[in-house]
């Protein structure tokens, strides 16, 4: 309804009927189990040339359903590697897919012309099409998305359980802790289904992680500083080698950290400077826990261009600015 109201959609329907027989492409954007139910209804409706695709984070369950229903020639699994911890149409934007990887998982029976057509369509949206087998896709997303979400949620639970009645840990957990656990605020309904549908890969990786954490505990018991040093060094080296020129599964956060004096009106001055230069703010505030942060004032912006422009504007006024 929101998309219709703002003009993105020309029309929408609340039931599946023969109207969908004229569709060239149908995107299934509900949770995996719901999409599988929709497939059963669509089978007798869509035309032979219609392309069916989904945007789910797990591929093998829906690919299996497609095979059972005899719809392989019409289906290409899809997974845009974009998003944030916020869900729903209100948090979408018109450049969401630009320079983002878009996984495609066609079956052996998918019509070649449909694969070519859909790849061109995806590239036309500014995304980078990458073809994978369903099982490859599910392991990759378990490693770089599903397990990290579980770990982020567990870190939050760890602090929540350790917090006392006065809520001191919550009060002090701003800055770095809130950044690394941001994805723990994702939709519980969506993650319930993801974990159910990709449980095998998730359990394999979590078991490996538990083993590694136990090794850290063992080495701490031995007071093995060299091991701890190498542990962080290897992690840092690999993390620094990860490219950031394209969008990944986690929506990139564009931030400026600014050194400001503790004086009345300082935040308003900074905000006014940015507004005067047509730079929109997503959020702005003082960082009270700055153990791992640079700068007193944190400014969250909407995109990389705004971030660079904002830094330039403030630096020209002699503010010390750090870009993240």
Task: List where the protein language model places each region.
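NAD(P)-binding Rossmann-fold cofactor-contacting core
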Residues: 1-8
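Short acidic-hydrophobic, aromatic-tinged amphipathic segments that line or gate anion-handling sites
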Residues: 10-15, 130-132, 323
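Rossmann-like NAD(P)-binding element
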Residues: 16-51
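Redox-cofactor binding/interface segments in oxidoreductases and associated redox assembly factors
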Residues: 27-28, 53, 104, 152
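Rossmann-like NAD(P)(H) cofactor-binding subdomain of soluble oxidoreductases
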Residues: 40-90
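Internal alpha-helical scaffold of NAD(P)-dependent oxidoreductase catalytic cores
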Residues: 96-183
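Interdomain hinge/lid region at the active-site interface
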Residues: 165-235
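A conserved regulatory-domain signal marking ACT and ACT-like small-molecule sensing domains
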Residues: 238-324
């Amino acid at each position: 309804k929101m998309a219709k109201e703002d003009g993105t959609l020309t029309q929408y329907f609340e039931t599946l009927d023969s109207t969908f027989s004229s569709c060239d492409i149908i995107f299934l954007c509900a949770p995996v189990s719901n999409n599988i139910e929709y497939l059963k209804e669509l089978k007798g409706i869509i035309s032979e040339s219609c392309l069916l695709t989904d945007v789910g984070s797990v591929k093998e369950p829906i690919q299996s359903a497609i095979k059972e229903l005899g719809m392989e020639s019409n289906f290409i699994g899809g997974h845009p590697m974009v998003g944030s911890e916020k869900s729903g149409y209100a948090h979408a934007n018109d450049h969401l897919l630009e320079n983002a990887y878009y996984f495609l998982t066609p079956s052996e029976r998918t019509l070649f012309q449909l694969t070519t057509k859909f790849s061109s369509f995806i590239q036309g949206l500014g995304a980078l099409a990458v073809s994978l087998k369903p099982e490859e896709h599910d392991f990759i997303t378990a490693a770089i998305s599903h397990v990290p979400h579980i770990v982020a949620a567990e870190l939050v639970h760890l602090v929540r359980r350790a917090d006392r009645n006065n809520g001191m840990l919550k009060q002090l957990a701003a800055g770095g802790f809130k950044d690394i656990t941001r994805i723990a605020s994702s939709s519980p309904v969506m993650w319930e289904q993801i974990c159910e549908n990709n449980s095998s890969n998730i359990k394999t990786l979590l078991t490996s992680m538990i083993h590694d954490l136990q090794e850290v505990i063992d080495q701490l018991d031995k007071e093995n500083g060299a091991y701890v040093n190498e542990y962080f060094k290897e992690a840092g080296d690999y993390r620094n080698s990860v490219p950031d020129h394209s969008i990944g599964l986690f929506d990139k956060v564009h931030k400026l950290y600014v050194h400001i004096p503790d004086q009345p009106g300082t935040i308003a001055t900074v905000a006014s400077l940015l507004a005067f230069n047509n730079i929109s703010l997503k959020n702005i505030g003082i960082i009270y826990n700055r153990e791992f942060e640079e700068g007193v004032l944190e400014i969250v912006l909407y995109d990389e261009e705004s971030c660079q422009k904002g830094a330039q504007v403030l630096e020209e006024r002699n503010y010390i600015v750090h870009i993240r």
